[in-house]
Amino acid sequence: MRKLANLVSVLTMLISLNVATAYAEQPALATLNAQFETTECALPCKKSIKTNWWMWRTPTQVELKKSNAANSELWTMQDNNQLNYQFLMHDEKRVIEYSSIDLKMLNMQADAEKWQVLNSLVSQKDLAAMKKTKLKKQYQGLDLTTYAGKINGIKTNITWIDALQIPLQLIYVYPKNQITVQLIKRDTADLLAGATTAAQLQAYQQVDYADIGDMEHSSTAKVWLSNATDAPGMHTHGHQH
């Protein structure tokens, strides 16, 4: 069973399932500070792999960070509906910047469709195509709706928090395995506690992804690059000479 090595892999499956569908307009996003747990297991789920991760979301930005990790990912929606991607290395106080060209070369989608799945885990188009049932129970006083159906042929069950535009629980059932994403904590006292601030980001050393290949022979760069193995495309750079 595939191990979820980093946060990119936690969300890759969700994004690949959802961004293939047509883009549908999304309701306004509330600022969110939430912790999720992704569980992957081979059916009948006697053993599982669990990954805890955080999402800090504003209407124009999403930061994703695996619990206790030294790195995080920052996605920012630009005015032109293109996504800006940064890989933040907090211990090294560095940020790897990826241009739109870099993202295309790495086959990473960076448009309004992907933004919707990043900030809500499910697209509005997919929700609209599923069987919808209002629940009597609530989550922290917020209304819940269940959605049942298939996303790209995969059996899917969602318990949706309408006001937050995020799942309380999301279950994908494959022929041989199951993936569950569960909201386990929501901080309402400080919506951005733990998120990287603009001041922190400004103090970090900016590194362009396109320049990393030229740094690999620097002994200083090799030290911090060794801690960037989870950054997109770094396995490719590691094989260049």
Where in the sequence are the language-model features?
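An acidic-aromatic
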Residues: 53-120
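Hydrophobic/aromatic beta-strand elements that line small-molecule binding cavities or substrate pockets
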Residues: 50-55, 73-77, 156-160, 183-187
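Solvent-exposed loop and beta-edge segments used for protein-protein assembly and interaction
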Residues: 26-30, 79, 141, 164
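Positively charged n-region of N-terminal signal peptides that target proteins for export
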Residues: 1-5
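Solvent-exposed helix/loop surface patches that form functional interfaces
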Residues: 108-125, 130, 164, 169-171, ...
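N-terminal leader/targeting segments and the immediate start of mature chains
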Residues: 6-60, 200-232, 236-241
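Surface-exposed, polar helix/loop patches in the mature regions of secreted/periplasmic/lumenal proteins
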Residues: 91-157
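Gly/Pro-enriched, hydrophobic low-complexity segments
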Residues: 63-67, 86-91, 139-205
